[in-house]
Regions:
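Glycine-rich adenosine-cofactor-binding loop
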Residues: 1-18
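NAD(P)-binding Rossmann-fold cofactor-contacting core
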Residues: 23-42
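Short, basic/aromatic-enriched C-terminal tail that caps enzymatic domains
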Residues: 200-220
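Phosphate-bearing ligand-interacting subdomains
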Residues: 37-98
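Short, solvent-exposed amphipathic alpha-helical segments in soluble enzyme
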Residues: 19-23, 80-83
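Short active-site oxyanion
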Residues: 1-3, 29-30, 61-64
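Short hydrophobic segments within beta-strands
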Residues: 6-7, 33, 67
């Protein structure tokens, strides 16, 4: 099975595909598709851009992975364009992920060491980055981006086009509605209305110019 990656903004996908192809010998990564000529100079670790998105119209035996995902709406636009070209979407699940009794929508990306517990459902074209845990019976919509080291507790309901940034966590039975953006290291203990931006709790300096004996109070 030949696979092309859409977009060059997430070169880490190369390593993820290599992990999978080490197990699935039929899988072959053949290169990137990108419409932006400014990306031609990107470092692609020995790989190359083989064409623009419309390349897929003439290579319909090739599966695609959409790696444009920081903006869920841009991801949807690219997906719809690819569907017009007749693209077939590859659902990427890293071999280290645990997902028995979970359902995963077409074209989604599940990265290293993710845990999707029984009863979890993931909509189409959603992205779950490394070391994220989604607990039992939680429902994740389509075109979502969930960052590294996120913990979603049981029976959460996550709408479509939601971004949950790295290190965030939720309480059980929470709902995050469509289009909301959750900042880094956020703690969600209530429902979040649609199209909200939840800010991160930035670190702050509490003391300066401390000597080592003073620092030891905070380290030990």
């Amino acid at each position: 099975m030949d696979v092309a990656v859409i977009g060059t903004g997430y070169p880490e996908i190369i390593g993820l595909l290599e992990d999978l192809s080490a197990i699935n010998k039929d899988l072959k990564f053949i290169g990137f598709l990108d419409d932006n000529p400014n990306n031609n100079s990107r470092k692609l670790y020995g790989n190359k851009i083989i064409g623009k998105l419309n390349w897929i119209k003439h290579h319909k035996d090739v599966y695609v992975i959409n790696s444009i995902f920081r903006n869920p709406y841009s991801r949807e636009q690219v997906t719809l364009k690819l569907k017009e070209f007749g693209a077939k979407f590859f659902t990427f699940i890293h071999p280290s992920a645990s997902y028995k009794y979970a359902s995963i929508g077409e074209g989604s990306i599940i990265c290293r060491n993710c845990i999707l517990e029984p009863g979890v459902s993931i909509g189409e074209q959603s992205v779950i980055l490394h070391n994220t845990v989604i607990s039992h019976d939680s429902k994740i919509g389509k075109y979502n981006f969930i960052g590294n080291n996120v913990t979603i507790q049981g029976k959460n309901l996550i709408g479509d086009y939601v971004t949950i940034s790295a290190g965030s966590s939720t309480c059980p039975n929470c709902e995050i509605m469509e289009g909301s953006l959750i900042g880094i290291n956020s703690f969600i203990n209530k429902n979040i209305p649609e199209r909200c931006i939840l800010g991160s709790p930035p670190s702050r300096i509490i003391k300066t110019n401390q000597k080592f004996p003073e620092l030891n109070k905070y380290i030990n």
